[in-house]
Curated annotation (Swiss-Prot):
Disulfide bridges in this chain: none
Gene it is expressed from: aroQ
Full protein name: 3-dehydroquinate dehydratase
GO molecular function, one term: 3-dehydroquinate dehydratase activity
Keyword Lyase applies: yes
Reactions it catalyzes: 3-dehydroquinate = 3-dehydroshikimate + H2O
Pfam families per UniProt: DHquinase_II
Subunit structure comment from the entry: Homododecamer.
Pathway in which this enzyme or protein is active: Metabolic intermediate biosynthesis; chorismate biosynthesis; chorismate from D-erythrose 4-phosphate and phosphoenolpyruvate: step 3/7
């Protein structure tokens, strides 16, 4: 069994810490990776963090994860609400999937209330800031370990 967890991030998350800090905070994607790597290492796992502004590239990473990862944490960002293609790719992945959002999408614009990814996700975290990623990694570690 692989002990790698893929952490996939969608559009504009490369600007984390710079874009709308009143919503997304001041920490960066590098901070997310560092914090997730620490949590995973405590449990004997490793992480591979990836970000893309391009839907097809995210799908390619999900396909790669089929052979290389025990679980996926995904923040599809705006693709959450629009991408049946990402949903279909996640359906082809057999391990656990946790959907993670930094902000509480249910307190925001109504178009953000629907998630295609939730149809596949084993759990959803929203509104916990980047701590949500750490919680997601803890849960994925547990699920990958059979818990």
């Amino acid at each position: 069994m692989t002990t790698t967890i893929y952490i996939l991030n969608g559009p504009n998350l490369n600007l984390l810490g710079q874009r709308q800090p009143e919503i997304y905070g001041h920490e960066t994607l590098a901070d997310v990776e560092r914090r997730c790597a620490e949590v995973a290492a405590e449990k004997g796992f490793s992480v591979r963090l990836f970000q893309s502004n391009h839907e097809g590239t995210i799908i390619d990473q999900i396909h790669e994860a089929r052979q290389a990862a025990c679980g996926i944490v995904i923040n599809p960002a705006a693709y959450t609400h629009t991408s049946v293609a990402i949903l279909d790719a996640l359906h082809a992945f057999e391990g656990p999937v946790i959907e993670c959002h930094i902000s509480n999408v249910h307190k925001r614009e109504s178009f953000r209330h629907h998630s295609y990814v939730s149809l596949r996700a084993d759990g959803v975290l929203a509104g916990f800031g980047i701590e949500g990623y750490e919680l997601a990694v803890r849960r994925i570690c547990s699920l990958c370990a059979g818990g």
